[in-house]
């Protein structure tokens, strides 16, 4: 241990107390023992340190900070160097605000387009996610503070996120959902990592020994602190035993007593507590020293400029018929769409930043070189039909050379705590597009959304530009692209399917009950569409430019590929060169191809550059569940180099030496996984891949019953709580603004009452509530009252002892 000198000064109760938070965003400290308290804070695309009363959902005001583009946006830049710059700026702002741990980045795999929090995550591909997240972590930690990558792991939905069980086969777990985290841990060495809310194969992530000990700490060598998601601890003692360091936010005295009792009963040992405390002290002492050294200032203007550059480099040009873009200087434009006036530039929830400033499309238009003939909102933001607004917009469109039509998803469509209902734009926006296009065929659609959309309306626009959620400076960056000041170089980090019905997890997202079956296995995103031969609207890695690029002279072996890329157009631009690995006629089933390297290349008009793409130890491996290790199938592989997953320009065959492991699927009937057509995998085949029966999906009346499931109980009071929460949710939907507090409560298990109330409610009181919900009303009420009195007395005694020590 590194900190024996401090640990030996503390008694067991003090040590146990340090392993849970003091307030919503601070740890406990003991000045006499030389242990300072530190502050943790959201978020993944900017610092969200709350100024007054703290809450984990971003409901109360926070200190102004730079709002950078979200991870889903910056992933489209395919530029780790840019990600590192953003991370460095966020780390600087965090340290200036005395934040020691910045809770991000998020790198959950985008299993489904409907996950309401996809705007916070990088990609459907673990390699791209891992490389981008590692860059953010390096940048943040260059300032001496800690990043905290999240949510570890298999956390791909918001519905019942604190109580759902992600049922996934081991190979898919390792190859798809953990590889991004593996890259981050091994390449960027984060000082902290956040465990996810959910269970993984029946065991909560925060107490999952296979996840935290076997893989994270032993196999990957992680020696930092594992922090729970806020309220995400189920069994605090098991978490400590199996590798979880710090329970947040502030569970109060009950958490301390739980650990004390666990040590005394032999459930865990004092050595377990000491190991976790040693990890925590390393985090606390290192980051506290960095915060103390900081000047408490940063260059807000420079960070705004960086935010604008990041947004611009992440813009994806999806369609550009007749080379409508870029627009020449002086072009008369009609600006239409509510988002031009009130931009959607970030997501809702714990990542929401109180931006220092926010550029709007209308504000930046005067400096763009374009001539505005006027602005019309065109549609109601929450989707209500408005014929007058549409008529005004159509009349304005007829007066212009081109229309800049700003469309997108509103605040209720994508948010923490809420999954999307569909992949569609609102009907009133589509109707407006059709009407505007009739008035002016030179219609440019600008989309602001944190995830992919269905585009049946694509024929009604001449150009389509995806700005995602561009942060506080995204509007100016978009105009830089539209007027040609910046040549778009972004490419999609997720596939845009033609329809939700085409997506691989359509029948199992987000699960009808507590169990969420990851039945599609390895076939997520482009891995599915290309293997199963499903057409898409826009493939993974797609993005157009105002210039053209030629690929030539590919030379490759099992370690690297070298080629020449030439800008054959008349203006400078950036090309993202992508390398996919394929094994035709493989014995071990696998996706048709997988991204294994990429590089972003800046080229002047007419310039050629040699590009070398290096293949690492993950290029040819697969997880063999029979040998429980990484293996390589030997033989001939194809290295496919191209401008997108569907636009392969050059290929090379390479011979790879295998490990000669036995086929883990020998003798097993897995036809859907062999073909990749996994939308309709039958139960028997899924159980064969899983290696066990499909778990029971019934709601149980226990500590992990969510408030949104109380209608399954036997208590009138429980039914009343459920009815009130449901009514409040429906009211917020009608207003068009998510009520994050109600959403959190709706998906919150009963045990979280003891984890989120700073000790006001104990787990004993929760057990009394469970008894009431089970129908034992009188006995349950008596227990709640008894445990409440007991909790007040014990908390007062504990706090008195801790203060005096």
Could you describe each region identified by the protein language model?
Residues 693-805:
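Long, compositionally biased, glycine/small-hydrophobic-enriched stretches that function as flexible linkers
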Residues 652-724:
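Charged, amphipathic alpha-helical linkers/stalks
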Residues 75, 227, 493, 627, ...:
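Intrinsically disordered regions, especially transient/low-confidence alpha-helical propensity segments
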Residues 617-664:
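Terminal connector regions
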Residues 1-622, 636-641, 645, 758-760, ...:
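Glycoside hydrolase catalytic-domain context in secreted enzymes
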